[in-house]
From Swiss-Prot:
Residue ranges the record marks as coiled coil: none
Record GO terms (molecular function): endopeptidase activity
UniProt organism field: Mycoplasma capricolum subsp. capricolum (strain California kid / ATCC 27343 / NCTC 10154)
Lineage: Bacteria, Bacillati, Mycoplasmatota, Mollicutes, Mycoplasmataceae
Protein name as catalogued: Uncharacterized protein MCAP_0715
Pfam families per UniProt: Rce1-like (PF02517)
One of the GO BP terms on file: CAAX-box protein maturation
Listed InterPro entries: CAAX_protease, Rce1/LyrA-like_dom
Length: 336
């Protein structure tokens, strides 16, 4: 049986573990206690994690009784999550209107809402123009959706770098002066996250005797690789750009930089960030496939904490992690 003292000691070790002070940390220190964790931290915990999790678990458990399809379940989950996010954002902003955007918390709350609205707007535009009415255009539709997502996330990145104090300068200085420290640490966290994460996930589904298959998020992204023709290669290039370069930076700004600032307690931030990262990747509502994303989010959170709140480390670690996944996905298409 695990003693409570052992758990406390473990979390204290996580809290205190970090790289040595370097010039970038002294010039642009990250404030892990920007807000009050018992107030602002709880707003984030409940609006972005607890309420969405309760909702998606309830929908999955009672799906048969409620007589809802997988598509409708995903839609209900997305709409309810946006509602919880909006309420949380209003409460948080009413308490901290001056720092809401500069701290990055506004981006944390705004990201899922903006992504949905941006995708909806361009989806409606495509339907109005009638570009993808023909069934033969499914492959081009996938490319279009990937392009829309890429543009949306690039806009979030640009906005974040322009609003969050010193973020752009800190990242530039880290890459310029600390590459010898940054790259090995990022690779180490990526490798550990990938292999430990996949091992733990396999153990979980084996012990629980689950036959989950591929997550709907992963399935939706990978299925266009099976299409023949030029569209397959266009999609592949866009997929690599989004997955390895754009998405890791955007998601780390949201799930680490902004969330750690808002929660303002290192240990609680690691827990909340890991769960939130999982929720971000189950928009279809398949909660049983949340585990690998939560585990990955946990290691990226550790990278952020270990680097004293330096976005560059968890971002690069996330990129390397995704690169491993992309290489394996593409290799599986050609190696039988």
């Amino acid at each position: 049986m695990i003693k409570k003292s052992s758990i406390k000691k473990y979390f204290k070790t996580i809290k205190d573990s970090s790289i040595k002070d370097i010039s970038v940390d002294q010039q642009y220190p990250f404030d892990f206690k920007f807000y009050k964790p018992k107030v602002e931290g709880m707003i984030i915990l409940f609006s972005l994690v607890i309420l969405p999790l309760i909702t998606v678990i309830f929908l999955n458990v009672f799906k048969t009784q409620l007589n809802i399809t997988d598509e409708r379940l995903g839609l209900i989950f997305q709409l309810s999550s946006i509602l919880f996010t909006l309420v949380g954002a209003i409460i948080f902003w009413s308490r901290n209107p001056m720092s809401f955007w500069k701290s990055g918390v506004g981006i944390l709350f705004g990201f899922p809402i903006f992504l949905q609205l941006f995708g909806l707007a361009f989806g409606l535009l495509a339907n109005l123009v009638g570009v993808f009415n023909n069934n033969n255009n499914n492959a081009w539709s996938d490319i279009y959706n990937l392009l829309v997502q890429s543009v949306a996330e690039i806009l979030v990145i640009i906005f974040a770098f322009s609003k969050i104090n010193n973020l752009k300068s800190k990242v530039k200085k880290t890459f310029k002066e600390n590459k010898k420290l940054l790259i090995p640490i990022a690779i180490a966290f990526a490798i550990v996250a990938f292999f430990v994460g996949n091992t733990l996930y396999s153990l979980i589904i084996t012990e629980l005797k689950l036959n989950l298959g591929e997550s709907k998020n992963q399935e939706g992204l990978v299925s266009p690789f099976k299409v023949q023709g030029i569209t397959k290669y266009i999609y592949m290039v866009l997929f690599i750009i989004l997955t390895v370069f754009i998405a890791p930076l955007c998601e780390e700004i949201v799930a680490r930089q902004a969330l750690f600032t808002g929660v303002s307690n290192k240990v609680l931030s690691i827990i909340v960030s890991s769960l939130y990262f999982g929720i971000l990747h189950i928009s279809s509502g398949d909660v049983y496939n949340i585990f690998p994303y939560v585990i990955g989010g946990f290691f990226f959170s550790l990278a952020f904490s270990f680097s004293k709140g330096n976005l560059s480390y968890c971002w690069l670690s996330h990129s390397f992690y995704n690169l491993i996944s992309v290489v394996l996905i593409i290799a599986s298409l050609y190696i039988k």
